[in-house]
C-alpha cells in the first residue's frame, strides 16, 4: 500500500468510528431530565416536603418554617431551598466580596445516596472555603484550592450555581454576641 492509500484508509476508519459511535441507544437529554424530575418529585414526596411558591416565601419574610419542613421553589434558578437560619451579620452588598466557610451534604437523588459531605468522619475538620462576590446583584464564587473538599473531589474551583442562590436571602458574618447564629 502506498502512503496515500494508508492515510485515506485511516481517515475513512476514523470517520466511520465517529459516525457509528455517535449513534447509540443511550438515553436522550429529554429522558435524563425526565428521570431527574421524577427523582426530585419522589424525594419531595418521601421526605414530606411542603413546597412554597416564591410569593408565599416572600410574604413570610423570606424564611421557611423548618418545623413544617417547608422549602421554597425558586422558578428562575430551578432550586428548592430551605433556610434553616438567616445568619448573623449582613447580606453581601453589591460590589462586595466575602470569604465564606460552609458545610454541606451532597445527595444523589437518582441513587438515593450521600454523594459527599464535610459534616462527618475525617472531613468534619474541613470547611469549604469560598470567595463570594456580588456584582450588581449577581453572585459568583470560587473555592480556594487546598481549602475545599469540593475542590479536592471535583478538581475545580467553580462553585455550583445552586450554592449561590441563598446569598440573596441570608446574612454573612461572625457571631458578635451571645445568641448570634451563623
Residue ranges and their predicted role:
Residues 1-11:
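Bacterial N-terminal signal peptides that target proteins for export
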Residues 24-87:
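Acidic/polar, low-complexity intrinsically disordered N-terminal segments immediately downstream
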Residues 72-75, 93-99, 175-178:
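Extracellular/periplasmic catalytic domains that process cell-envelope and extracellular macromolecules
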Residues 85-86, 109-182:
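A beta-strand/beta-hairpin structural motif
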Residues 91-96, 131-133:
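Short consensus segments that form the blades of beta-propeller domains
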Amino acid at each position: 500500500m502506498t502512503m496515500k492509500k494508508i492515510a485515506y484508509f485511516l481517515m475513512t476508519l476514523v470517520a466511520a468510528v465517529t459516525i457509528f459511535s455517535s449513534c447509540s441507544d443511550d438515553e436522550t437529554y429529554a429522558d435524563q431530565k425526565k428521570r431527574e424530575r421524577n427523582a426530585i418529585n419522589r424525594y419531595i414526596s418521601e421526605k414530606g416536603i411542603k413546597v412554597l411558591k416564591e410569593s408565599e416565601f416572600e410574604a413570610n419574610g423570606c424564611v421557611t418554617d423548618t418545623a413544617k419542613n417547608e422549602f421554597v421553589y425558586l422558578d428562575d434558578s430551578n432550586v428548592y431551598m430551605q433556610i434553616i437560619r438567616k445568619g448573623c451579620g449582613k447580606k453581601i452588598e453589591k460590589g462586595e466580596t466575602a470569604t465564606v466557610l460552609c458545610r454541606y451534604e451532597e445527595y444523589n437523588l437518582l441513587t438515593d445516596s450521600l454523594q459527599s459531605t464535610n459534616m462527618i468522619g475525617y472531613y468534619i475538620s474541613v470547611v469549604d472555603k469560598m470567595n463570594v462576590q456580588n456584582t450588581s446583584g449577581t453572585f459568583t464564587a470560587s473555592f480556594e484550592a487546598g481549602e475545599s473538599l469540593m475542590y479536592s473531589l471535583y478538581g475545580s474551583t467553580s462553585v455550583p450555581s445552586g450554592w449561590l442562590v441563598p446569598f440573596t436571602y441570608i446574612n454573612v458574618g461572625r457571631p458578635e454576641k451571645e445568641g448570634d447564629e451563623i
